[in-house]
Amino acid sequence: MKYQLQKTDGRARLGKLIFERGLVDTPAFMPVGTYGSVKSMTPDEITETGAQIILGNTFHLWLRPGQDVIKLHGDLHDFMQWQGPILTDSGGFQVFSLNSMRKIEEKGVSFRHPLNGSEIFLSPEKSMEIQLDLGSDIVMVFDECPPYPSDLIYMKSSMEMSLRWANRSREHFNNLNNKNALFGIIQGGLSLELRETSLQGLLQIGFDGYAIGGLAVGEPKEEMYRVLDFLCPRIPDNKPRYLMGVGKPENLVEGVRRGIDMFDCVMPTRNARNGHLFVTHGVIKIRNTRYKTDISPLDPDCDCYTCRHYSRAYLHHLDRCNEILGARLNSIHNVRYYQRLMADLRHAIYEERLECFVEEFYKKIGLSIS
């Protein structure tokens, strides 16, 4: 993978990620394919939304169907028939969300299989091996994801262990002769001092890109933006910057303003399944009775398949009847909304009018600029 920085507007960056499997324009949003699928959508439909890269979940794919089954097909691209680049997380976030079901040690994490109760073990080395078998174009280091809030003593200890795990991840990644990209993950909670220590430690190890983890876990948005304001100028300009798990449209806009290149979140598809649809002027809750007789398109400004063919009344009907087609059409729209937003942000950076775009964006959705 190579990163090309093409233009800046303030701190916002326009660029490209170059893979053997294709190009990714940045800033980019990655739809999440937890179990080897972006829920309810085919690869062709994902491509039609404008998405160029997706995210796969190492932890869940390791448990089901298992890396051996995926290897029978070749790799994850062949298994799910997505031929573009794939980023896989390390499994750390999912393991640490198990709480009482897991035990953290220096060597790794032991936990109970959430499906059958058997004891299994995940380490930095094992995570690198799984992601190699998945054929991940971008591999993430194994790290600890401390809960919010956490006291400073625990946060410091966790960050230091994540640095040691990052070093082990890098060493085993190299030993496996993996030719794809490996990203480090900056931890440290809301402490700028710990964030600085984490970043400097990762820079000494050396990675192809740098992710910011441990945000969007319940902290006020102002705190998240404070951490981004601190970190982004300190990450080398020639490396991509990835803000993990952040997905509200306004958070994407603020991340781009601060110099973030990559985002992922389940929000577009999860909200779609719950009838919460992102449109130019905010959010439509399609199951509300007011849409029962509304024959207008979901979003007149949107060019997705759903908006070109169906009315709000029809989508309301599908949602009320729990029809699977409703979830599919809603997902197509929400993912396209996110891709349109990223394309608009890229175009605004190219034309050096990002702040004008941001002001217009907030006026349309009825929020103030952060």
From Swiss-Prot:
Keywords: Glycosyltransferase, Metal-binding, Queuosine biosynthesis, Transferase, tRNA processing, Zinc. Residues 245-251, 269-273 are annotated as: RNA binding. Zn(2+) binds at C302, C304, C307, H333. Its cofactor is Zn(2+). It is an enzyme of class 2 (transferase). One of its GO terms (cellular component) is cytosol. One of its GO terms (molecular function) is metal ion binding. Substrate binds at D89, S90, G91, G92, F93, D143, Q187, G214. The active site is at D89, D264. InterPro entries: ArchSynthase1/Queuine_TRR, TGT, TGT-like_sf, tRNA_ribo_trans-like. NCBIfam families: Q_tRNA_tgt, tgt_general. Homodimer. Within each dimer, one monomer is responsible for RNA recognition and catalysis, while the other monomer binds to the replacement base PreQ1. Belongs to the queuine tRNA-ribosyltransferase family. Catalyzes the base-exchange of a guanine (G) residue with the queuine precursor 7-aminomethyl-7-deazaguanine (PreQ1) at position 34 (anticodon wobble position) in tRNAs with GU(N) anticodons (tRNA-Asp, -Asn, -His and -Tyr). Catalysis occurs through a double-displacement mechanism. The nucleophile active site attacks the C1' of nucleotide 34 to detach the guanine base from the RNA, forming a covalent enzyme-RNA intermediate. The proton acceptor active site deprotonates the incoming PreQ1, allowing a nucleophilic attack on the C1' of the ribose to form the product. This is Queuine tRNA-ribosyltransferase. It comes from Hamiltonella defensa subsp. Acyrthosiphon pisum (strain 5AT).
